Amino acid sequence: MAKVIGIDLGTTNSCVAIMDGAQPRVIENSEGARTTPSIVGFTDSERLVGQPAKRQAVTNPSNTVFAVKRLIGRRVGDAEVEKDKKLVPYSIVNGGNGDAWVEVRGEKYSPSQISAFILQKMKETAEAYLGESVTQAVITVPAYFNDAQRQATKDAGKIAGLEVLRIINEPTAAALAYGLDKKDTKTIAVYDLGGGTFDITILEIDDGLFEVKSTNGDTFLGGEDFDMRIVNYLADEFKKEHGVDLTLDKMALQRLKEAAEKAKIELSSSQQTEINQPFISMDRNTGQPLHMVMKLTRAKLESLVGDLIKKSLKPCEAALKDAGVSKSDIDEVVLVGGMTRMPRVVEEVTKFFGKEPHKGVNPDEVVALGAAIQAGVLQGDVKDVVLLDVTPLSLGIETLGGVFTRLIDRNTTIPTKKSQVFSTAEDNQNAVTIRVFQGEREMAADNKLLGQFNLEDIPPAPRGMPQIEVTFDIDANGIVSVSAKDKGTGKSQNITIQASGGLSDEDIEKMVRDAEANAEADKKRRELVETKNQGESLLHSTRKSIEEHGDKVDPSTVEAIELAMGALEEALKSEDAGKIKGGIQNLTEAAMRLGEAIYKASQAEGGATPDEEGPRSVDDDIVDADFEDLGENKRK
């Protein structure tokens, strides 16, 4: 049975894991790293994902997309999107349906598509390790993601060629990895501060039962915001000194961003770091190059980002209140996400909860490990684990006067189903529009509109007479479907919520086809590169053999080999893999005659003819050996 993989699709880095026996295991990518940068770069000839994309970001800033998770399921007019527009070097545009998309090299891509490219890399990483095709996955999302963002993540999986068996909340996944082997009853808080999002989740763990009591967070608070504080500080200081605004130069901005991230990481283990960026700009008056050499202390960094850390504590208060527990009731605080390595973050969390956080999990890998455990549960490989998660935000509809009427409150255990009867607002009203919202504000317009649909052909009747039953259904992924039924006529209408905007089935199918076509093109390009490498290697070895042994064969053989070499050299200048393979075949056959002549000459020098020596068996020089399979590299 094919493995179900667990993927942590992160804002800054992504990670893939599987169940290896009874324990989850992170899989290294083709570069040998356990996490992959969530970055996609587009060059003239190819698409790069992960570390190769990150390496070329400085020289190709407009065509390198990072932190796209912050855009997933969002609209162009959103305040957060407008803020990001000013900070990133790539273009954020209207996807045509009001959704925020990115534009690279004249092509528009949805955040789901960009995420799919990263998921494909994770899929390929798992396939290379397992030696078999992977088609199913569990993917994690921030606990505070709304329905539109969850749906968009599921779409990304589909575009990448994966059946997403479950969307699981990141803090819940981390709790699974933390509590898999723990038998005692505990109440834990998972504080998850990642690259782009923040979540706090309160759970009860009791011998394999993981019950989420409450969750809260901020989907626009993370390491990217910390980096931008440093970038703005560096740019301001440079402007004061040289009168040049580096934020207007996309290449300089990308260099600043990389320097800021590096400085932030270094200041987690040292008190001071130096930011050194030579030739970052030019003096407009003198034409002389300008260099940035600046010291940044941990104290200065903490003053720049102190309010961001404090901002994460408000959701912690709300989560404790919703769970009905006090700080003293929390037995363990688990830190998740790369930003929790920052000493000031650890200090503030310790001060808030009144206890030292648990240090036994790797904050970069624990979410992927939890996703793999959930994959194991769904596959039947992991027994005695029951996960009860919650919906992060209240769900309801707009009623008379624009009021938001809740049907399902936040932190309700999922899956769940809830119905309520409504009526018409006017006499003889023959249709109603059901507008579905998600959020905590009292007026519908202040919440997130998830979608709308009409229930028509209601028989004429006085206002308040018709009975319209509205039913909300939330599945285990946290994805919502809504139905409305006229109890008088039995007529009903239902939808699985698609964000106002979002990707239609046709959009997704087109993107799946594009992804498959690109995969085929990538495969052909790789085949061409490998064939060229093979040809170059053959040319080199043949040339060396002629230099060393050309005098041992007749001139006509050397001439035939040199002709074949010339033909292969010409073929290598083309982009035709078939032509190159033909050249390799011809040169291989020609070079074989050289090999035969060399062996004959060496045998003659040794005083024996080939006939005297007798025909050699292919197996003459092969030594039989017994190998013991130690099981270390067995693939399941």
Curated annotation (Swiss-Prot):
One of its GO terms (molecular function) is ATP binding. InterPro entries: ATPase_NBD, Chaperone_DnaK, Heat_shock_70_CS, HSP70_C_sf, HSP70_peptide-bd_sf, Hsp_70_fam. This is Chaperone protein DnaK. It holds the Pfam family HSP70. It comes from Cereibacter sphaeroides (strain ATCC 17023 / DSM 158 / JCM 6121 / CCUG 31486 / LMG 2827 / NBRC 12203 / NCIMB 8253 / ATH 2.4.1.). Acts as a chaperone. Belongs to the heat shock protein 70 family. Keywords: ATP-binding, Chaperone, Nucleotide-binding, Phosphoprotein, Stress response. The modification Phosphothreonine is found at T197. Residues 602-636 are annotated as: Disordered. It comes from the Bacteria. CDD domains: ASKHA_NBD_HSP70_HSPA9 (cd11733). Residues 620-630 have a biased composition (Acidic residues). Induction: By stress conditions e.g. heat shock. The keyword RNA-binding does not apply.
